[in-house]
Amino acid sequence: MFDSVFKDIRYELTRGNTLTKIILINCAVFIALLLAKIIITTVNGGDSNIYYLFTNWITLPTSFGQLMYQPWSLFTYSFVHEGLLHILFNMLLLYWFGAIAGDLIGDRRIFPIYFYGAFFGGLF
């Protein structure tokens, strides 16, 4: 059963459109962070401070001064989602509006728009 799911995911990553790849990458990062949170919290006896230190390192800081010390967060924050509803609605909206944008401007331009949107959204 899981073998066919992994085959479908592998197929979409190799031959799917850009929008599907972005959604799958976001979901993979969400699952990886969720597993990391579970493992770190379990190993540390319920203390998840190390997890929050890591997520603070990859999420967008609130002050511009702190952004100068972690400029990579302008790119990584767009892949970090904290809750199930957060990622669900973000990916639904990305799928719906991304499909419309892909039809209008072409599939090749979806990733640059996502990338620049995340970058400038983080700046402003």
Language model regions located:
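C-terminal transmembrane module of polytopic alpha-helical membrane proteins
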Residues: 1-18
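N-terminal TM1-TM2 helical hairpin plus the immediately adjacent luminal interfacial "cap"
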Residues: 15-124
